[in-house]
Swiss-Prot record:
Keywords, alphabetical: Antioxidant, Disulfide bond, Oxidoreductase, Peroxidase, Redox-active center
Active site, per annotation: C132 (proton donor), C135 (cysteine sulfenic acid (-soh) intermediate)
Protein name as catalogued: Alkyl hydroperoxide reductase AhpD
Cysteine disulfide partners in this protein: C132-C135
Pfam name, any one: CMD
Family under the similarity heading: Belongs to the AhpD family.
Reactions catalysed according to its record: N(6)-[(R)-dihydrolipoyl]-L-lysyl-[lipoyl-carrier protein] + a hydroperoxide = N(6)-[(R)-lipoyl]-L-lysyl-[lipoyl-carrier protein] + an alcohol + H2O
Gene expressing this chain: ahpD
Length: 194
């Protein structure tokens, strides 16, 4: 399903999210197309709703290079890992963890092949979705040091929050039932007692 058709299925209780999508994505004036659509793709991937991600990636292919689409998905992947690790360090009462080596590969942070500031913005947005304050502060600091404006940062966070909200709506509205291709446990439906 294309993105517009998917957005047309947004129920009345989530109308604000559909309107926000129009305002922060369709009517965006703060971010470049790559900054915007990379943020949209990265946040959709981090929000983990397959229906929304598929529709967004399909539309993004007309706005981003294939490399940028992959880099945005890569930002969601590597930052989701980092967000868990660094959020643990930040929240743990035992501060010794902050002095210990991460021991996790993070090469993609330097090998994504897109503008480093754009990638940094996507990393910040994914960190907001995943709720890692330590990562939010680190990525915001890099952007501000490179004279990236707070208005642009907040524009990306508006996108992140809207995409996450839409993912929640589509999760809530997706029909439930057996997973396609998964074996069905017929014993669960048996009326015979053992």
């Amino acid at each position: 399903m294309n993105l517009e058709a998917l957005l047309d299925t947004v129920p009345a209780y989530a109308r604000d999210l559909k309107l926000n999508f129009s305002a922060v994505v369709r009517q965006n004036t703060e971010l470049t197309e790559q900054q915007l659509w990379g943020t949209v793709v990265a946040c959709a991937a981090a929000s983990r709703n397959r229906t929304l991600l598929d529709a967004i990636v399909e539309e993004a292919k007309g706005k981003l290079s294939a490399q940028a689409v992959e880099a945005a998905k890569g930002a969601a992947a590597i930052l989701s890992m980092n967000n868990i690790f660094y959020r643990f360090q930040h929240l743990a009462v035992n501060k010794k963890y902050e002095t210990m080596r991460a021991g996790l590969r993070m090469n993609f942070l330097r090998q994504h092949g897109v503008d480093p500031l754009d990638f940094e913005l996507w990393a910040l947005a994914v960190s907001a979705v995943n709720g890692c304050g330590k990562c939010i502060d680190a990525h915001e600091r890099v952007l501000l040091q490179k004279e990236f404006s707070e208005e642009k940062i907040l524009a990306a966070i508006r996108v992140a929050s809207t995409i996450y909200g839409l993912a929640v709506v589509f999760d809530a509205e997706e029909p439930k039932g057996d997973l396609v291709g998964a074996p069905v446990n017929t014993d669960a439906y048996s009326t015979t007692t053992i």
